[in-house]
Amino acid sequence: MASQDKYYLFLDECGDQNLSSFDPNFPIFTLCGIIVSEQNLGILETQINDLKMRLWKNINIIFHSRDIRKCQNGFENFFDLSVKQDFYKSINEILGQDIYVVICCAILKEPYIRQYGKMNDVYGQSLSFIMERTVFYLDSLKNCNANLTTVIERRGKKEDNALLDYYNRVLDKGTYWVTSDRMKKYFKKFEMKWKKDNIVGLQIADLIAYPVTRYILNPEGVNYAFDVINKNIYQDRGKLYGLKVFPKET
C-alpha cells in the first residue's frame, strides 16, 4: 500500500450565521480554511511559538484576531507601539510564506436572504464550497496521496453536533462538482479542539479570516494583512478557486 501524505484543513469563521438579525455594517459570514502539509505545519508551529516566547515569554497566549485588534486578553502589551510593530512585522513574515493554501467562502447575507430566505444554512453552504475546493487543490498536486484531517474549534455540545452533521452530510452527498467517493478519497478524519488547546493551525485560520472578510466588504480599502496572504489564496490556471463569494451580486 502506497504511503500517504498527511495534510490538515483548519477552519475558522468571521461573523455569525444569524440571518434573522445582523449588523448592516457587517452583513457577511466568512468560513476560512487553511490547507497545510504535516511538514509545513511543523514549521509554522515552531515559528509561531518562537514569536510567542519572544514577546510573551510563554507559548500559552492564544492568537485571536479580535483580541489583537482590541489589545485585550493578553495583548495589552500592544499599547506599547514598539511591541505591536514587532508583532505585526514578525507575523506578516510568517504568514507571507508560501507553505500553506487559503480557501475561503463568504456569504453575503442580504442577497442570500433575497434569493434563499432566512431559514437556509449558511455554514453548511460555506463548508460544502470549501470541501469541494479542497478536493480541487489536492487533485492538482502531483503524485499526491493525501490523508486529510479537518480541524474545527469546539463551540459547545449542540453546536459541535451541528458541525459534525454538516461535515458528514457533505461527505456523504458530495457536491455538484465533486462526488462523495472523490471527497472520501481525501477527507479521512474530523477533529474538534477547544480554543484553550492552543492549536496553531486554528489560530492562523482566525488571523486570516478577518482581513479576507474586510477585503470582500471593501476591496479598494487599505488592507495590509490581506496583501500579505493574498498570494496564498488557491488559484489554478488563472482561476481563483480559493475565494468564493456567494451569492454573486446581480
Language-model features, listed with the residues they occupy:
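Phosphate-ester processing/binding pockets and catalytic centers
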Residues: 1-250
